[in-house]
Amino acid sequence: MSDINLPLSFSDAAATRVKMLIAEEENPALKLRVYITGGGCSGFQYGFTFDESVNEGDTTIENSGVTLVVDPMSLQYLIGGVVDYTEGLEGSRFFVNNPNATTTCGCGASFSV
């Protein structure tokens, strides 16, 4: 992650977990797609899914041989953020450390700008 001009960061922890999940699926074409949808208690919520394709206009960010994909509409809400992964007492999850969020819900799954 030496390219400081990227609009969004993909942490080593998230990349490591994605690499493990892709290996379990036995499909090296998979990429982690992060997206924003309306909903949640704060107005917007984060979504994560695996996708084999990169659409026109998508931004891709690579770390440790795995790719994060973001569509242009979602990227505007994620600029300057970090896609990360954590394991703790509350379970394991991908999350976004988003500097654009003015408020977030208690679990961190939704936000407002």
Swiss-Prot record:
Q: Write out the GO cellular component annotations.
A: cytosol
What family is this protein classified in? Belongs to the HesB/IscA family.
Name the chain's protein.
Iron-sulfur cluster insertion protein ErpA
Keyword flag Metal-binding:
yes
Annotated residues that bind iron-sulfur cluster are located at 41, 105, 107
Q: Which cofactor does it need?
A: iron-sulfur cluster
Keyword tags: Iron, Iron-sulfur, Metal-binding
Q: Name one GO biological process term.
A: iron-sulfur cluster assembly
| InterPro entries assigned | FeS_biogenesis, FeS_cluster_insertion, FeS_cluster_insertion_CS, FeS_cluster_insertion_RrpA, HesB-like_dom_sf
Give a Pfam family name.
Fe-S_biosyn
- Annotated disulfide bonds: none
What are the GO MF terms of this UniProt record?
Answer: 2 iron, 2 sulfur cluster binding; 4 iron, 4 sulfur cluster binding; iron ion binding
Per the record, the gene is erpA
**Species whose genome carries this gene:** Vibrio vulnificus (strain YJ016)
- Report the protein's function: Required for insertion of 4Fe-4S clusters for at least IspG.
Cofactor binding summary note? Binds 1 iron-sulfur cluster per subunit.
What is known about its subunit structure?
Homodimer.
- Does Magnesium count among this protein's keywords? no
